[in-house]
């Protein structure tokens, strides 16, 4: 008779990040030190298996990419650097890695239509408690670095730069 041994994992070692707003800050911290996204990137970059799993899933989700026809031809080039297809692929990886993604939507000067769409590195975005304002920082680890704020994407208020923000639903977790 053969025996089967199961390797166990100490689940208590793996903790989900805390999301909380400090009294003197407008944004919600992403982890106890507000650097949890960098931890996720580090895992992604240092583990060949983890990297292969996520990039493999990204490839499957992306498939043949976006097929843009008709009126969407206007968005084939979402901005001067990226096509909408390239932005879509970046958002897929952010969704898999962080559980969310963010887009910067820039309205034309007249306020009639979207002029440009940019992918925003999700690791550099924080939100306020009710997800109506977003904060971008290239270096969250540096307390002196500049934080830029944006309003939530609102097709009724067609002005300036706004953020379209998607985050996976997690029961009992705010923002």
Short names for language-model regions:
Residues 1-175:
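Structured, contiguous alpha/beta core segments that scaffold functional sites
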């Amino acid at each position: 008779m053969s025996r089967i041994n199961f390797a166990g994992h100490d689940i208590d070692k793996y903790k989900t990040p805390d999301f909380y707003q400090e009294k003197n800050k407008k944004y919600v911290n992403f982890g106890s030190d507000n650097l949890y996204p960098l931890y996720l990137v580090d895992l992604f970059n240092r583990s060949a298996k983890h990297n292969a799993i996520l990039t493999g899933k990204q490839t499957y989700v992306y498939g043949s990419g976006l097929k843009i026809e008709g009126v969407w031809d206007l968005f084939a080039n979402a901005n001067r650097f990226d096509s909408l297809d390239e932005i879509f692929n970046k958002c897929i990886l952010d969704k898999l890695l962080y559980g969310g993604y963010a887009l910067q939507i820039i309205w034309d000067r007249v306020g009639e239509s979207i002029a440009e769409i940019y992918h925003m590195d999700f690791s550099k975005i924080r939100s306020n408690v009710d997800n109506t304002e977003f904060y971008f920082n290239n270096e969250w680890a540096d307390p002196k670095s500049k934080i830029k704020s944006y309003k939530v994407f609102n097709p009724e208020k067609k002005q300036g730069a706004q953020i379209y923000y998607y985050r996976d639903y997690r029961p009992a977790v705010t923002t």
